[in-house]
Structures are given as C-alpha cells and as structure tokens.
Amino acid sequence: MKGNRIITIGRQIGSGGSEIGMEVAKRLGIQCYDRQLIEMACNYGELDQDILAEAEEKRPNPFLYSVPRQMQNDKTGRGIAINDMVFNLQSEVIRRLAEKESCVIIGRCADYVLREQPGVTSVFIYADMNVRIACLMERRRITRDEAITLIKKTDKSRRNYYECYTGKRWGAGASYDVTLNSAELGLDTCVDLICSLYERKQEGDAQAR
C-alpha cells in the first residue's frame, strides 16, 4: 500500500454521499468502489451474488446464522453467520484494493477495515432530513411517506451494521476524520473539500520523501 491514498465515505441515504464519492474519484483520476464490492467479494469467495447482496451492510441475523455447507470454503470460513462471512469477504477485498491502488470506497465499514493502514482519510456525509426526503422523492419517484420509511429503515440498518462490526458510533464526528453536511455545503463544495484534503496529503507525502 506504500504511496496509496484511500478515501472512505460513510453516508446517510439521500445525502448524496455516493454521488460525491464518484465525483471525487473522477476528479482525482482514481477508481470509486461501491456496489461492485458485492460482485468482487462474490468472485473472491466463489459465492452466489444474490446471497451476499441480501446480507450486505446488514447486522447479523439469527435466522441466517450459519453458512450453508455447500457455500463453505477456505475463503468464506466455516460455521459462521452469513453476515459475518459477507463482512469478512468484503473486508479482504477492501484490504487488497488498498494495497493495489489509490481509490474511493463507499460504505462497508471501510474506515474501520483500513484503520491501521496509513494514507486513509475517512469521511461521513450527512444532510438535513427534509433535504434527504426531497432527494429520494425525486430520484426514486416515491411519496413523502415512502421516503421517510426508507430513510428510517436504511439508517437503522446501516447504524446497526456499522456499530456491530466497528464498536464505534455511526455518523458521529469522533468516528471519522471529516464529517460534511451536504445540504449546507452543497455537493460541489463537499467534492472540492475532499479533493483538497487528498491532494494536500499527497503533497505532504512527496515532501516527506
């Protein structure tokens, strides 16, 4: 991982966090990894993608406790919960990506997975509730009530997942290097700030050498 710079982005649904991450990667000329991490974890663990997608970014479920015998192999582990298996596989993929290249990684507790690695900047993107509701209503063509329900469900799922595997508070300032209110700052300013931080650290590395 020597010389690689990684930006991890945690986000509230409807905050524009994923869009910010993709634009940061585009501007910096690096890759952004989000949903494709599911496919990469499946390929690494030699598993069916639908099974991993169902358990991905969800707290361990007692009704999905053990990995079916036919799915078990040296990479998945044996006798563990499906959610734990998904977390372990994605964590290994994230570590391999960090070793290979500079990139942006969205969600998946990447800040925690790479906590002992140098060159990692962790960011959390949040926004006011009304802004998130409006965003989801427009993007997904759903009603206000449906947007509120989706926000509450997704927030709960991501919070439980993050706090279960990291022992830290999801969305709390102390859990990340930087927290940004995209509703107040705007998506473009959030992108500018993250890119500026990335470039400063890169310049610092060059001077240190």
Residue ranges with predicted function:
Residues 9-25:
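Glycine-rich phosphate-binding P-loop
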Residues 61-67, 143-187:
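Small-molecule kinase domains that catalyze NTP-dependent phosphoryl transfer to phosphate-bearing small molecules
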Residues 97, 103, 110-116:
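RNA pseudouridine synthases
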Residues 31-42:
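Short beta-strand-centered segment that lines the nucleotide-binding/catalytic pocket of NTP-utilizing
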Residues 3-11, 101:
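Pre-Walker A (Motif I) flank of P-loop NTPase domains
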Residues 91-95, 164-209:
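NTP-dependent small-molecule kinase module
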Residues 116-139, 144-152:
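Conserved phosphate-donor/acceptor-positioning beta-strand/loop module used by diverse small-molecule
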Residues 42-102:
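ATP-dependent small-molecule kinase phosphotransfer cores
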